[in-house]
Design a protein with these regions (language model features):
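N-terminal Rossmann-like dinucleotide-binding module
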Residues: 1-47
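Local beta-strand N-terminus motif with an aromatic residue
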Residues: 28, 47, 73-76, 150-153
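A contiguous active-site-proximal alpha/beta segment in oxidoreductase catalytic domains
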Residues: 83, 106-166
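Beta-loop-alpha module in the N-terminal Rossmann-like domain of NAD(P)-dependent dehydrogenases
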Residues: 50-100, 104-116
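C-terminal substrate-binding/catalytic lobe of Rossmann-fold NAD(P)-dependent oxidoreductases
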Residues: 213-266
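C-terminal helix-rich "cap/oligomerization" subdomain common to oxidoreductases
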Residues: 64-68, 75-77, 273-317
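Rossmann-like dinucleotide-binding domain that binds NAD(P)(H)
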Residues: 166-236, 287-291
Length: 317
């Protein structure tokens, strides 16, 4: 049994980490969150110590590491806001623990370079939650593409719309410097999945950017990808809005729907199982999507020219 600490317990993704820690037979001993609205802990690890200040949390896990008798923290799971991931990963490694971090691992490629040095200095590894890679449908599609030796280039339309209310624009998520923007917030797992299956980026074009919407084109080794991401519920197809739906997700591959709506419930647990078996995703697995999102963030939109997503034809200018 390993001892875990968790940074960021009040967010929506943290319970999946708590569940994964429990289902893999391990123990959560310490939690850091600036909010004390973390009653969800009672469902999984009611004996875990809660800290509201980073300094006291840091001191606590350091002291545990010196006590011996199996009390040291072996892994620190990180579910904090995007811009804090780098610092919290470093905190874990400084305390002789492995880090398990939610995506996006970091916001910029130079953060990855620094963390590689930190791994070498401490001898501890940084693991990464990329659960879509473990989805059965994604694995099956990757096997199909890998087996196709024809060199065919596939045409893909990625559309993801998830409505967000006014609260979003008052939170850290709306701050580009803290979140990385819309592509990092809601697009990162798709970009990772597509490059995992269809290969490296050869061209990255941005057609449209606003606070709530972004769209562009990616030329991958084995695919041409038109992508559209939005937080504006008005972009959800009208028939779905009439049903009260606020989210729409679609991936078309050569005009055929790629279906992977189900099978998400245990993916974090599977990710933890692989990490504990020494087979988890690492820093190198983050570089593609970090590079994509960083480039999009720093690139001006070119407008509706070239291979742009069809949803842009009707978007409010």
């Amino acid at each position: 049994m390993y001892n875990f600490a968790l940074i960021g317990a009040a967010g929506y993704i943290a319970p999946r980490h708590m569940q994964a820690i429990k289902e893999t037979g391990n123990n959560l001993v310490a939690i850091l969150d600036k909010s004390d609205s973390v009653g969800i802990i009672d469902r999984y690890f009611p004996e875990a110590a809660l800290f509201l200040e980073t300094e006291r949390f840091d001191r606590h896990i350091y002291r545990l590491s010196k006590k011996g008798d199996g009390q040291q923290v072996d892994y620190v799971s990180i579910c904090s806001p995007n811009y804090l991931h780098d610092a919290h990963i470093r905190l874990a490694l400084r305390n002789n623990a492995y880090a398990i971090c939610e995506k996006p691992l970091v916001l910029n490629t130079w953060n990855l370079d620094g963390l590689e040095d930190m791994e070498k200095d401490t001898g501890k590894k940084i693991f990464h939650i990329l659960q879509l890679r473990l989805h059965p449908s994604v694995q099956k599609l990757k096997e199909k593409i890998d087996a196709d030796k024809s060199g065919k280039i596939y045409d893909i339309d990625l559309t993801y719309i998830t409505g967000r209310g006014k609260w979003y624009y008052y939170s850290w998520k709306a701050d580009m410097a803290k979140s990385g923007g819309i592509t990092t917030n809601i697009g990162v797992h798709f970009f990772d999945m597509l490059t995992y299956i269809f290969g490296q980026v050869k061209e990255n074009i941005v057609h449209y950017k606003s606070d709530s919407t972004a769209a562009g084109f990616l030329q991958l080794e084995r695919a041409r990808v038109r992508w559209f991401l939005s937080l504006d519920v008005r972009h959800v197809p009208a028939d779905l809005r009439a049903q009260g739906k606020t989210t729409y997700r679609s991936i078309l591959i050569d005009n055929e729907t790629f279906e992977f709506s189900d099978g998400f419930t245990d993916l974090h647990t599977r990710a933890y199982e692989k990490i504990l078996a020494g087979e988890g995703f690492t820093l190198k697995d983050a570089r593609n999507y970090v590079s994509i999102c960083q480039a999009i963030r720093n690139t001006d939109a070119v407008g509706l020219i070239g291979e742009y997503h069809p949803y842009l034809q009707n978007i409010d200018k």
